[in-house]
Curated annotation (Swiss-Prot):
Keywords recorded for this protein, A-Z: ATP synthesis, CF(1), Hydrogen ion transport, Ion transport, Membrane, Thylakoid, Transport
InterPro entries reported for this sequence: ATP_synth_F1_ATPase_gsu (IPR035968), ATP_synth_F1_gsu (IPR000131)
Protein name, per record: ATP synthase gamma chain
Subcellular location: Cellular thylakoid membrane
GO molecular function terms attached to this record: ATP binding; proton-transporting ATP synthase activity, rotational mechanism
Record note on quaternary structure: F-type ATPases have 2 components, CF(1) - the catalytic core - and CF(0) - the membrane proton channel. CF(1) has five subunits: alpha(3), beta(3), gamma(1), delta(1), epsilon(1). CF(0) has three main subunits: a, b and c.
Chief place where the protein resides: membrane
HAMAP family per UniProt: ATP_synth_gamma_bact
CDD domains on file: F1-ATPase_gamma (cd12151)
Membrane topology: Peripheral membrane protein
């Protein structure tokens, strides 16, 4: 059995670690709320832009539009845009995206396509660069804002737009983590280019509020405030041709779609980190209890041994 000093030192170490994980959990919880609010703040613009595109759609056939971002072509090269984080300590968040990207990459190769990668986040960059003989990397981005902004989305959008318009890639898919709740986030694959803005619809958002109950953090679910925008009047007259409008608005629509993916990924990363730190804190608490029990047993055994030695010495 370990001596008392070693056990006591380990108890102190575990308690200090728990303080750190608790602090990280609280920081992640606060940032999750901010990330959710960021998504909602970008919603009115996204809704209005989608309705304008729907209005244009109702007046023309997109198949006949002279809009390169809408035109499908024979697919040979497919670019996968993988979104991970720059840091760890967030459970399986980064690992799940990397595994899904590998799965999709190999699936496309088996189907006869030529896949390549655009990577966002240090975790994906480090992983795939170490396996550069197996995976072709087209570009990468790192050190984005913790809560992604339109500037972050614009830099990535410019890169993938240039690749698509130059026909160096025929389709672009984004692999990101869809934020469902604080305890549920799923990796999803979504086609970014060519665009298909028909049937645009957004799912209802939910806000998660952190409160305290019995001295512990608990999660309460709130309905997100509605950002529904009025429909455009049917008698609106566009001064420019529909083709000109589409070519001006579709890059904005693409950027907004990418921004939404980045924001959901950021919220998912923070939620995963909060959950991981919560589990770590609980494990540290249980380990401290076990060590305290071990310490008390060892201390009791040492005292008993001393008593026996004293009794034995007096008897002799």
């Amino acid at each position: 059995m370990a001596n008392l000093k070693e056990i006591r030192d380990r108890i102190v170490s575990v308690k200090n670690t728990r303080k750190i994980t608790e602090a990280m959990r609280l920081v992640a919880a606060a940032k999750v709320r901010r990330a959710q609010e960021q998504v909602l703040r970008s919603r009115p613009f996204a809704d209005r832009l989608a309705r304008v595109l729907q209005n244009i759609q109702s007046r023309m056939q997109f198949e006949t539009a002279d809009a390169p971002l809408l035109k499908s072509r024979d697919v040979r090269t497919i670019t996968l845009l993988a979104v991970t984080g720059d840091r760890g300590l967030c459970g399986g968040y980064n690992t799940n995206i990397i595994k899904r990207t590998e799965q999709r990459y190999n699936e496309l190769k088996r189907q006869g396509f030529t896949p390549d990668l655009v990577l966002i986040g240090r975790k994906a960059i480090g992983y795939f660069q170490n396996r550069s003989s197996q995976y072709k990397i087209r570009a990468f981005f790192q050190d984005l804002e913790q809560v992604p902004t339109s500037k972050d989305a614009e830099s990535v959008t410019s890169e993938i737009l240039a690749e698509f318009l130059s026909k160096s890639t025929d389709r672009i898919e984004v692999i990101y983590t869809k934020f469902i709740s604080l305890v549920s986030c799923n990796p999803v694959v979504q086609t970014l280019l060519p665009l298909d803005p028909q049937g645009i619809a957004e799912e209802d958002d939910e806000m998660f509020r952190l409160t305290t109950k019995n001295s512990r953090l608990v999660v309460e679910k709130d309905a997100a405030p509605s950002n529904e925008q009025p429909k455009l009047p049917s008698d609106v007259v566009f001064e420019q041709s529909p083709d000109q409008l589409l070519n001006a608005l579709l890059p904005l629509y693409l950027q907004n779609q990418l921004l939404r993916a980045l924001q959901e990924s950021a919220a998912s990363e923070l939620a995963s980190r909060m959950t991981a730190m919560n589990n770590a804190s609980d494990n540290a608490k249980e380990l401290a209890k076990t060590l305290n029990l071990t310490y008390n047993k060892a201390r009791q055994a040492a005292i008993t041994q001393e008593i026996l030695e004293v009794v034995g010495g007096s008897s002799s």
